């Protein structure tokens, strides 16, 4: 699971990210490349097209939704099953849930690892990342390099208790 979150847990406003952090976009690409992605329909709409070199799975209740280059599932369980199959085929160990708020809320109990870009601002928004319970432990924190006028931010990897391993944050 991967997200960029403000201090007050905001991840989006009116279908958009409330910030522009090029280094975070590079981090997102490095962490998700070649891994199956699970996202809600609104998140897919905000991206606007399938992300290359990744299986894009869109979860929606809309039974008429279709889009070239994505696979559509109508519940999270079937999305996880499809992503699991693809992860085995690709030889990757992670499935990446990339949003939005409803999908994060539903998927968090199933997650064992989180990659969060924690942005040191409070912003108004309408989409939020769920609170983490005490079962999550910070494993690694790397300070970002904000450009002038950008807020400070850190790239943070969390593991659920009992799920820690030696996988470090990707370089670059």
Predicted regions and their residues:
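Flexible, gly/pro- and Lys/Arg-enriched active-site loops
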Residues: 2-165, 169-170
């Amino acid at each position: 699971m991967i997200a960029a979150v403000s201090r007050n847990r905001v991840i989006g406003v009116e279908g958009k990210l409330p910030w522009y952090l090029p280094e975070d976009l590079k981090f997102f690409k490095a962490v998700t490349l070649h891994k199956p992605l699970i996202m809600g329909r609104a998140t897919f709409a905000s991206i606007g097209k399938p992300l290359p070199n990744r299986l894009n799975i869109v979860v929606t209740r809309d039974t008429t939704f279709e889009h070239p280059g994505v696979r559509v599932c109508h519940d999270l369980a079937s999305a996880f099953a499809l992503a699991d199959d693809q992860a085995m085929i690709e030889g990757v160990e992670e499935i990446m849930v990339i949003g939005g708020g409803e999908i994060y809320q539903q998927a968090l109990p199933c997650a064992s690892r989180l990659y969060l870009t924690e942005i040191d601002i409070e912003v108004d928004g309408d989409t939020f990342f769920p609170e983490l319970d005490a079962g999550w432990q910070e494993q690694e924190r790397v300070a970002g390099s904000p450009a002038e006028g950008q807020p400070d931010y850190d790239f943070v990897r969390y593991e659920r208790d009992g799920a820690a391993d030696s996988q470090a944050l990707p370089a670059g």
